[in-house]
C-alpha cells in the first residue's frame, strides 16, 4: 500500500483497481494465522492493525530497511517499529531485513538485524547488525498468544479501539496515482497535495461527507 515515496515509483494495488478488502490477506496455517506487510508499510500503524483485525497472529515483515534509520543507534527505527507493532496488536512479529553494503549508494547501507518479537514486544532473537546472511530462530507459542488474547483485560488495544473517534481515516490524504505516469517528480507533487490535505482539520461530518457519508 505504501511504496517508499518519492523514490519508489509504484502504485498501491487499490490505485489500479484492487479491492481494499483483499489487500491485507491472512493465511490460516497449522502454525497460526500469518499476515505479511512489506518494508515501509510498517511505519503506518493502520497496515498491521488491519492484519490483526483480519486475524493475524504472526505478522511477517520483509524489508530492505536502511541506515541511518535502520537497526543501529541512535535512531534504530527498525527495532522501535517492530516492537511497537507487536505490542499494540498482541501478535508475534517475524522481521527479516537485508544485510548489505553497496558502494554505489553512499551513505546508505542495509544493516540487517532481523528479529523475532513476541506479543508483548519482547525481542526473542535478533541477528547482529551488519552485512551477510544470518539465521534467527526462536519459539513462537501460538497457544500462549491465543490464551493471552482471551485472558487480557488491560492493554487489549484491539478490543479497546474507538474507531468512531478517528475522523482522519475517512478523509483522503495522499492522492491516488490516477492514470499519469508514476515518477519521482510526480510523487513529490502528490506529497505536497497530501501535506495540504493533512493540514485540514476534520470534523466527523466533514470526514463522513468526503467518504460518501449519510445524506440529509
Predicted features along the sequence, with ranges:
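C-terminal beta-strand edge segments of enzyme domains
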Residues: 88, 97-205, 209-216
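Catalytic-core segment of enzymes that process non-peptidic bonds
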Residues: 1-36, 87-130
Amino acid at each position: 500500500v505504501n511504496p517508499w515515496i518519492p523514490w519508489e515509483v509504484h502504485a498501491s494495488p487499490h490505485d489500479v483497481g484492487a479491492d481494499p478488502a483483499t489487500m491485507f490477506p491472512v493465511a490460516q496455517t497449522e502454525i497460526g494465522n500469518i499476515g505479511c506487510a512489506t518494508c515501509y508499510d510498517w511505519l503506518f500503524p493502520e497496515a498491521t492493525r488491519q492484519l490483526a483485525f483480519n486475524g493475524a497472529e504472526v505478522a511477517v515483515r520483509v524489508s530492505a530497511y536502511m541506515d541511518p534509520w535502520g537497526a543501529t543507534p541512535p535512531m534504530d527505527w527498525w527495532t522501535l517499529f517492530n516492537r511497537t507493532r507487536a505490542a499494540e496488536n498482541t501478535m508475534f512479529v517475524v522481521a527479516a531485513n537485508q544485510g548489505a553494503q553497496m558502494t554505489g549508494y553512499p551513505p546508505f547501507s542495509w544493516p540487517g538485524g532481523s528479529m523475532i518479537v513476541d506479543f508483548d514486544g519482547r525481542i526473542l532473537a535478533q541477528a547482529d547488525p551488519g552485512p551477510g546472511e544470518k539465521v534467527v530462530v526462536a519459539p513462537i507459542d501460538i497457544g500462549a498468544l491465543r490464551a493471552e488474547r482471551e485472558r487480557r483485560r488491560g492493554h487489549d488495544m484491539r478490543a479497546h479501539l474507538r474507531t468512531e473517534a478517528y475522523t482522519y481515516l475517512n478523509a483522503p490524504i495522499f492522492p491516488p496515482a490516477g492514470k499519469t505516469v508514476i515518477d519521482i517528480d510526480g510523487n513529490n507533487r502528490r506529497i505536497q497535495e497530501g501535506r495540504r490535505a493533512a493540514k485540514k482539520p476534520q470534523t466527523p461530518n466533514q470526514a463522513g461527507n468526503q467518504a460518501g457519508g449519510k445524506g440529509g
